[in-house]
From Swiss-Prot:
Disulfide bonds: none
Gene name per UniProt: pyrD
Taxonomy of the source species: Bacteria, Bacillati, Bacillota, Bacilli, Lactobacillales
Pfam families (UniProt xref): DHO_dh
Entry cofactors: FMN
Organism from which the protein derives: Lactobacillus johnsonii (strain CNCM I-12250 / La1 / NCC 533)
Protein name from the UniProt record: Dihydroorotate dehydrogenase A (fumarate)
């Protein structure tokens, strides 16, 4: 029997697979209705802000040969509507599924409001603090590139909420370990990494960027080596649990992230090619572990053999 069970603060995962925030919306998008979400370790909902946001100008998504460039911009109906109209029915449908809510805001007060309301709702098991979204003009990555800001925000959120918090790190920094340490110093219970890399694609005929927002976040297979490297670097700098993400499309990719130091993973862009990607990866994981002679996935955490 292969053990894929992973226990993290607030998240008791039957397997280490979850959808990256935004991938399955609030559990209400078509892809999330194609299978039982209980087949995954957890559900991560789309980033929630204090008030409704409409996102960035269209087009918001460009599919590239090696990934996806997006500038969606945290579209959501606002925290009160999310709790009432999204999380309440999701929790009713999945009473035992670990749910992580992603927290966003334009300023510190916004982050604190959303975090407290989501925590007090009793509907989620943990919070992911999104200080790394590159597609908003205020908040998001503007918070996540400054260690002192990350530490202070983490500390204030931690003092307000009753559930574990995971800080989502941006790769758009010189040294991601400084941000990781700042989150740890602020009291974070875990880390999520990486968010998307800033990128741009230009249509040579119109001479215009392909995205309405001009610049977007790059995800998918092109970023996987960067994500693996950063997970390793962060693992070397902290003992906090890590949820790794960035270009995962197979069970082998999951194992690679675990070897680099992640405890669990999130799957995002792979769903553009296969709407059931996370389920297929979860189903394949025990088979891949068996091939390697591994009986417990936790045995592989940070077990890369360096040259």
């Amino acid at each position: 029997m292969i053990n894929t069970h992973v226990k993290l603060p607030g998240l008791d995962l039957k397997n280490p697979i979850m959808p990256a925030s935004g991938t399955f919306g609030f559990g209400d998008v078509p892809a999330a209705k194609k299978f039982n979400l209980n087949d995954l370790g957890a559900m991560v909902i789309k980033t929630t802000t204090p008030h409704s946001t409409t996102g960035n100008p269209q087009p918001q998504i460009a599919v590239l040969n090696t990934g996806v460039l997006n500038s969606v911009g945290l579209t959501n109906p606002g925290v009160d509507a999310v709790i009432k109209d999204k999380l309440t029915p999701l929790r009713s449908e999945y009473p035992n599924l670990p749910i992580m809510a992603s927290v966003g805001g334009e300023d510190e007060a916004g982050y604190l409001e959303v975090a407290k309301k989501l925590s007090d709702s009793g509907l989620v098991n943990a919070l992911e603090i999104n200080v790394s979204c590159p597609n908003v003009n205020q908040g998001g990555m503007s918070f996540g590139v400054h260690p002192d800001v990350v530490e202070e925000l983490t500390k204030k959120i931690k003092s307000l909420v009753k559930i574990p918090i995971y800080v989502k790190l941006t790769p758009n920094v010189t040294d991601i370990t400084q941000i990781a340490k700042a989150a740890e110093n602020g009291g974070a219970d875990g880390l999520s990494l990486i968010n998307t890399l800033l990128g741009m694609e230009i249509d040579v005929e119109t001479r215009k960027p392909v995205l309405g927002h001009n610049i977007g976040g790059l995800s998918g297979e092109a970023v996987k080596p960067i994500a693996i490297r950063m997970v390793h670097q962060v693992r070397e700098s902290t003992t906090l649990p890590i949820i790794g993400m960035g270009g995962i499309s197979s069970a082998k990719d999951v194992i690679e992230f675990i070897l680099a130091g992640a405890n669990a993973v999130a799957v995002g862009t792979a769903h553009f090619k296969d709407s059931l990607a996370s389920k297929h990866i979860a189903d394949d994981l025990p088979k891949e572990l068996e091939k390697l002679g591994i009986t417990d996935i936790n045995q592989l955490v940070n077990k890369v053999n360096f040259n």
